[in-house]
């Protein structure tokens, strides 16, 4: 059992016979009345997103999720990605729908954590940051940085990130996978 006060992003709960993952949460303490927790939940089976409010301190059954360390091996076709279990060396193919937005950051050899519930893959935890090479971006013109502007850049995995004007093709940049933001250059 887990209290609604202990909700964090990524927490999994069982509700109405299904598994839900907390995407967003907000503890609200109104001036009058009791505190409550406003959440945005994603159904791990169907992908549906639902907003729900719980009383502060309300207990719910927590879904026991197994975390397995796996390595991305290669993409298979347009919609599948093959991962290898680091302990048993078994390979498993996951679809783009299962990976969600994380698919655009996958680079061969990258280590990720696969989340399983009752032997079914329900999600993937990527590293918080990745270092990728810029393969396509507009050239920066000298004097463009007076206002600190940004421009779109495409990286080696196909993801598009907004970067400062001084970034050029071939540079390696650090990207935050949680919000798709540029963090800095890498050597």
UniProtKB/Swiss-Prot annotation:
GO terms for molecular function: translation elongation factor activity. It holds the Pfam family Elong-fact-P_C. It is found in: Cytoplasm. Gene3D superfamilies: 2.30.30.30, Nucleic acid-binding proteins. Pathway: Protein biosynthesis; polypeptide chain elongation. GO terms for biological process: peptide biosynthetic process. The keyword Aminoacyl-tRNA synthetase does not apply. One of its GO terms (cellular component) is cytoplasm. Keywords: Cytoplasm, Elongation factor, Protein biosynthesis. PROSITE patterns: EFP. SMART domains: EFP, Elong-fact-P_C. Belongs to the elongation factor P family. Involved in peptide bond synthesis. Stimulates efficient translation and peptide-bond synthesis on native or reconstituted 70S ribosomes in vitro. Probably functions indirectly by altering the affinity of the ribosome for aminoacyl-tRNA, thus increasing their reactivity as acceptors for peptidyl transferase. NCBIfam families: efp (TIGR00038), PRK00529.1 (NF001810). This is Elongation factor P. It comes from Gloeobacter violaceus (strain ATCC 29082 / PCC 7421).
